Structures are given as structure tokens and as C-alpha cells.
Amino acid sequence: MKDPKAPIGVFDSGVGGLTVLKALRRLLPREEFLYFGDTARVPYGGKPLAMVRRFAWEIAGFLLRQGVKAIVVACNTASSAALPDLAEDLSVPVFGVVEPAARAARGFRKVGLIGTQATVESGAYPRYVDLAWAKACPLFVPLVEEGLWDDPVALLVARHYLEDAPKDLEALILGCTHYPFLKGAIGAVLPGVALLDSAELTAREVARALEAEGLLNPEGRGRTLHLVTGDPEAYRALAERLGERVEAVRRVSLEEL
């Protein structure tokens, strides 16, 4: 029997998954969280899917050893590479971010997708929604990880990637959890296009599932421990610039995974 008071594990290649963590905390204020950012190996998007799959299994195994009651793969690349196997083989509920965003896009006639090279090439999204256009945007994740989401260079890069988007595009799936931090630049290039991200929808799915399984924490204090494979203080500085209050952060060496 899983312990309702156990934490929820959330992981991403870096700070992108903080968008999902924020939505989870808003819906589940009593839950305790372990947020794992694989900052020593970010970005995932240009790496082979087999390598990303290995990373996802390493992190999921580590989180299980910390006693989590559920795992949220708050990374589109890792969700595309590993989610079906993780969900089938792990002993706790596992949630990804691909299907929730794809479901949100079904109400639009002409839908586009931007994501990492690995996510776009994986074909994960077309399993759930018809796409009129898709584009890999490999520089977007480094822009966010370097703290440049509101720098003029972000707008220049967005124009470079999005200039060939169809003029009649109705919705664009932000197929990477880093990309919501770039909504200002993306929206400036594609005014009038609905920008869809999966954070809120994923959080709702997690909340429904935990309630159905009797796993909601009745008396938690809503704390989050941040775990990173890179420099903890560099992570803290970046996360706090993104609006995340980091009360506790600890480095996890790759040898511990």
C-alpha cells in the first residue's frame, strides 16, 4: 500500500519542468514534491532517444528509491522517449506531458508543434493529434537555461524558427516544458495563435488519479526539495529568476543514479 504522505517526484532535463511543478502545487497545495533537474546533462533534445530513455530510467529509479508515490515526467523529450515503458513497468503511477497538450489541441482545425529535435522526430504527438506543421527549435532550451527568455535575442531566435509557420495556423503546441517561459517572444511572432502547454492539464490529470487511488496527502505542508545533477547555486539563481522560491536544493552526482 502506497503512503499518501509520500512525496510526488517530478523530473526534467533542467528548469522547464518548473512550469509543471507550479501547476501541480497550485492544484495540490498539501503535497510534498521532489523536483529533479538533470542540469549536468541538459539539454536532452539533441541527444539520441535511446540515451534520453536511459536518463529517464536512471532518474525514475532514483526517485523510487527516495520513496515517491507517483512520478511526473515533466519533459516532452523524456515523455516521448520513455513514458510508455515507465508507466507499464514502474510500481507507482507515472504521468507525462505529451498527451495532455495534444488533447487540448483537438478543438482547433490547424495545429502546429514546436519542440526539441528528439520530440519532433519521435512522432509522439501525431499519435494523438493531426499536425499541419512541426518545427524543431533547438536553441530555445539553452536560451531559457541561460536566463535569456526575455532578452532581445529570444525574439530574434523565435522569428528565425517561426517565420515559415502557416499563416492560417490556429494553435501551436509548446512541445517542451521550457517553452512557456518564451511565450512573450513566440506570441510576438505569431499573434492571434493559441499557445498550448501541458502544465495545467497534466496537473489536473495527476490530481484526479491520486484522488481516485486514495493517495492525496491530507496533512502535508507543501514543501519541495530540489535535486540537481549540476551546480546547485547556479540552479537556485536561475529558478528564482523564473519565480521559483527554492528553499532547499541538493546536488545528486551522476554516480548516485
Swiss-Prot record:
Top-level taxon: Bacteria
Record-given protein name: Glutamate racemase
Catalytic activity: L-glutamate = D-glutamate
Ranges annotated as spanning the membrane: none
Gene of this entry: murI
Gene Ontology molecular function terms on file: glutamate racemase activity
PROSITE patterns: ASP_GLU_RACEMASE_1, ASP_GLU_RACEMASE_2
Binding site for substrate: D12, S13, Y44, G45, N76, T77, T177, H178
